[in-house]
Amino acid sequence: QRQMCIRDSWWQEGSRECIDYGHKDAFQWITMIRLPDFVKKGDFEWAVKEASAKKKMDFSKVEFFTYEEGICVQCMHTGSYDSEMETIQKMKKYASDQGYEPDYSHRFHHEIYLSDPRRTAVEKLRTVIRNPVRKINDRR
């Protein structure tokens, strides 16, 4: 049985037009796991209660939410997390060539980790990188 992939959304406080990937230490993030569509909020709340009781851990910050990601540019990155900038630059150029620009006004850099870094060689790590975009000159 395949488990759902871990996802992170990253942002930097005060960065509305771009993100400084050279300063990942300033990133803030939320880690997510996509749930199957049949899981409803009541199911989630029951599971959190059960896990809290059985694991004796604090799950108070775990939450159930949905969101619309909007228009994005996305690419598969293979290799070290530290070499993602090269892929991100290619994505930015592709978006620009298509008439789009980055849009971090209310959306985030998003990574979907397809590989387990504990079991996968660094050069074989696979990460989907997704960045929000908007049409150039569409500054809502």
Task: Give the role of each language-model region.
Residues 9-16, 22-39:
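Extracellular-facing segments of soluble proteins and assemblies that are Gly/Ser/Thr-biased and enriched
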Residues 33, 128-135:
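A short, hydrophobic, proline-anchored segment that marks a local hinge/packing element in signaling
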Residues 48-53, 83-103:
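Long, well-ordered alpha-helical scaffolding segments within enzyme catalytic domains
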Residues 105-125:
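Beta-rich nucleic-acid/ligand-interaction surfaces
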